Amino acid sequence: MAHIHIKLTVSEWDIGGKSNTTSYVLDSEVTQVGEELVVNKAFPKRYTFIVKELSDTEICLSCECPPQYVHLKKGEPYHAEYNIEGYEDHDGCVWNGEDEYLTIEWL
């Protein structure tokens, strides 16, 4: 159906101001709508995408990260910012959440 060549960059910032940035280029042949694109085992599960729509100039992906649908156009990077909520573990220790910044570029 189409050849997809996209770059994902994720930056995570914790409450202490420490950051971690990871990038990965996905180069894949998509044969049908509904196909799963696994970015990389190193990326969290929420960055596994399902192809919902595909044309020569636009792709619609669904994923577990907010927002649920990503509309990506060639030459127009997509940016999202969200917070992964903190939690309290079984010992009562509160772990703070992280801010994440996601950029997707269709190369």
How should each PLM-predicted stretch be described?
Residues 1-3, 31-32, 105-107:
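Short intrinsically disordered terminal tails
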